[in-house]
Amino acid sequence: MAAELEGSKALGGLLSGLAQEAFHGHHGITEELLRSQLYPEVSLEEFRPFLAKMRGILKSIASADMDFNQLEAFLTAQTKKQGGITSDQAAVISKFWKNHKTKIRESLMNQSRWDSGLRGLSWRVDGKSQSRHSAQIHTPVAIMELEIGKSGQESEFLCLEFDEVKVSQLLKKLSEVEESISTLMQPA
């Protein structure tokens, strides 16, 4: 079993398959597909623990967004651990991470974003022409139109109307947001 799992080409393919499934959303990549294509001589019972170990290592590396010094320390620890990986496997994992780190990181960033984004904002100030109360007619109102959409799809528009009090509340909240961002951006 150990000899069959040592091949660097097969391990590189396995890591690519795991990355495609875990980080790039290709859900058709199953453990049976990986085993039959890359390790056909290994039984499913022997392959499962190896697959789980490699999946865990890859997820640990990606979730920590390891730089190459951290990666080297992590892989060295894995080679010294009982039931860990071999130094040849560590070399393949290191090479794989060096070649795929940027794409995996971008994919994780895209997965963590809110789907829709603000594409545009327009506003104007009008005089209110209709109201239940006659005293509110001809009072100024701010009308804001937000264009919201996902990339590659048609936008949706949201129209908001604010009186003077609501504009003041909105500006106060935006000032609080700006202050929080400024606080977080200051060097420690």
Swiss-Prot record:
Binding positions for Cu cation per the UniProt entry: H100, M109, H133
Transmembrane domains' residue ranges: none
Annotated localization: Nucleus; Cytoplasm; Endosome membrane; Cytoplasmic vesicle
UniProt source species: Canis lupus familiaris (Dog)
Domain COMM: 117-185
Gene: COMMD1
Pfam families assigned to the protein according to its UniProt record, in alphabetical order: COMM_domain, COMMD1_N
Post-translational modification: Ubiquitinated; undergoes both 'Lys-63'- and 'Lys-48'-linked polyubiquitination. Ubiquitinated by XIAP, leading to its proteasomal degradation.
Biological process, per Gene Ontology: copper ion homeostasis; negative regulation of NF-kappaB transcription factor activity; negative regulation of protein localization to cell surface; negative regulation of sodium ion transmembrane transport; positive regulation of protein ubiquitination; protein transport; regulation of proteasomal ubiquitin-dependent protein catabolic process
Identification of the protein by name: COMM domain-containing protein 1
Subunit structure and binding partners: Component of the commander complex consisting of the CCC subcomplex and the retriever subcomplex. Component of the CCC (COMMD/CCDC22/CCDC93) subcomplex consisting of COMMD1, COMMD2, COMMD3, COMMD4, COMMD5, COMMD6, COMMD7, COMMD8, COMMD9, COMMD10, CCDC22 and CCDC93; within the complex forms a heterodimer with COMMD6. Interacts with VPS35L; the interaction associates the CCC complex with the retriever complex. Identified in a complex with an E3 ubiquitin ligase complex composed of TCEB1/elongin C, CUL2, SOCS1 and RBX1; in the complex interacts directly with SOCS1 and CUL2.
